[in-house]
């Protein structure tokens, strides 16, 4: 079905029209249900009950008539139902949508002139109209649906469905995988989080050489995605799979997606395992990887997910293992908890092939055991009882993750909210021994900071549990750096459960001028979180200062191609300001210059990449004179501001941007530093070993390898196999090569130069199409932003626009006088033949074949400069022509009229108003008209009422 303005899903539309257009012919065999599915239906969430259909979520056993929008409206002769599958438990699990045509179920009527009442599928006799809602209509057909296109379905009236919540509030789905291999003792554990359309993974491993790649495959081994594994410390690999295809998401939710680690010694995968959903992941705060103790054994390993009870010192855990069963159906196991070889706890369990794992509780941990737990000194040993000795063991540590612990401190979140314009920014690292490293920046307080505490949420007023008293400010009074070593197991558990707060008290506000919630920020794929501090954003830094109760911080970095990566977090904004937040990158306040809007705000968070940053802003960034300005509806000139300094040596346009120093510190005025002051953490973009003679610069995972050379993402070059007449581009690890297409020369006798692909006119021979002319004077050439290249004055070319490649239906010209690039669409000539063809597949315009007829016909509608016409159901209709759409095999839809306007088809249902005042009518195409004969059984209800009153 063609695209229409209103219907949301063309395939759904066509399928339902095929069902609803059958002629009414009394009863008959029930039509088989067609597999109707919406193209844009939300993906079902694992474990959610109900069905998703047409962009809405329906409960189990709910029935509805699909609404196709205008002009088709609700298909009342089609009934859909959400059915529970037979294998699912009652009220649980995703349902199955079944739709069928219920027109054949309409009863046969005795009257000669049945009527069609609005909101009904079946016709009724006039004398039964008053009790039509009691007649034996097919189930589900008595509902009256409004025609208002903004009406809400039944599933929208209450709480939104699970699938809608998943995409509306940034809900994260977590999965875990145990990775082992038959020829190795290595064991790895992968934790994967699906957030919107990105898959963020943290993989920890033991007894494994540094992995080279992370690989995701389907059940048959087909590679779906690969990510370079940057060298990291502590056996941790981080990465992001962006824009995950829907099929891969379905495989993940069906637990059919497999993750593997590739090493130089095992290029075909050393360890692998399927990703499974585990509810215990949301509560996990401690973990363990269990490896073999016998150096001669292979292919066995396990992982443990542990958490503390919220009400007592009990350790709950889930243990997953592979290779212990040895092909047996049931195996008894023994679990021991050791400290320096001394047995502390022991329990027994049974494992089966169907459930290779078990859950247990270690109750009533002593204070000493709690201390050993947070210090990472408790060892977990799992042993197979009976048969050959088989033991795996590992130490319990705090959960490892690529996420970043951080906090934005603002006055709005203080125990007694204040509005001073001050702001705070904090970053944390939790070490394996339970120690917490903190770095806190404070900006804009009106008085001296007297206390900085890490504490729990107060249960009552003035009843706060302080876990750590932090050191005072240093480095000019704007920063505090230190270590909290006394959190304990309970404190570490609460920290990883996002249950702690950072409070800053000043002389003017001893109970707290700034306060922030310590939370884990999802890994975003770049190393800025680990090697530099965030930029604090405060109202006090706005000129003039703003006494805002909000605050924020931002991570910004430049990669080797001068692409700006940013991530902004805000706190303390009112609900009315949430949808009005914008962020701009600009130069010094009060100075004219370019500004760049940073897009991507999702609530109070924003992240993205700017790939074409202006050179002026790049210089401001490297010189430390750039500003990040946050504006809101109440403060359109600036709610928050931060000063940005990024030490970078990236290259843009053949020029190297180098700052004075690579390692900077926080300035006394609160400017954000870019030095790697945080302890070495898992760097997601760390470089792979560089080749001899290289600069050792980090390798972008999007680079391309072609003809023995590495090419960065976005690079353009002439390939060795055809250096004159081909052009290649690198687009995210994919090389696209296009032949150079020469436009027709504007002179009768062009000249072919030896060093050029296209012939040029003699007077313009000196104007060469060079890939880069950085030293051109004004008026000598043009810079084309599409492929980022300089062109000589007077040059004409077909543009190359990444990632689309060569655009042959456009010609660009460099106007030397002004330095402007003028691009226009290729004007295809009108053709008189009936079947034009393209002589070459790469041609833009069609031609008449040799020997073709001369039947008059419009030129290619896509290239014509006149009215374009409309394509509808595979046919072209001229501008302003109207028609009734045809739906095979049922023929013309006489009740719907379509018209072509401005190249877009518009369809609407014919209006049959005003209603007939005569009693009998005759169907004429769509609407009825009065006839001469009338009978009592065909008179309208108002006429019958008037006749009764007269009598």
Swiss-Prot record:
Glycans are attached at residues 350, 433, 880. One of its GO terms (molecular function) is BMP binding. Residues 171-280, 282-401, 402-523, 529-649 form the CHRD domain. One of its GO terms (cellular component) is extracellular space. Residues 145-170, 936-951 have a biased composition (Basic and acidic residues). Its main location: secreted. Keywords: Developmental protein, Glycoprotein, Repeat, Secreted, Signal. It holds the Pfam family VWC. PROSITE patterns: CHRD, VWFC_1, VWFC_2. GO terms for biological process: artery morphogenesis; BMP signaling pathway; cell population proliferation; central nervous system development; chordate pharynx development; cranial skeletal system development; descending aorta development; dorsal/ventral pattern formation. It comes from the Eukaryota. Residues 1-26 form the signal peptide. Residues 144-170, 669-701, 932-951 are annotated as: Disordered. Cleaved by tolloid proteases; cleavage participates in dorsoventral patterning during early development. It is found in: Secreted. The keyword Secreted applies. Residues 49-126, 702-762, 782-848, 870-930 form the VWFC domain. Interacts with TWSG1 and/or BMP4. PANTHER family: CHORDIN. Dorsalizing factor. Key developmental protein that dorsalizes early vertebrate embryonic tissues by binding to ventralizing TGF-beta family bone morphogenetic proteins (BMPs) and sequestering them in latent complexes. Belongs to the chordin family. This is Chordin.
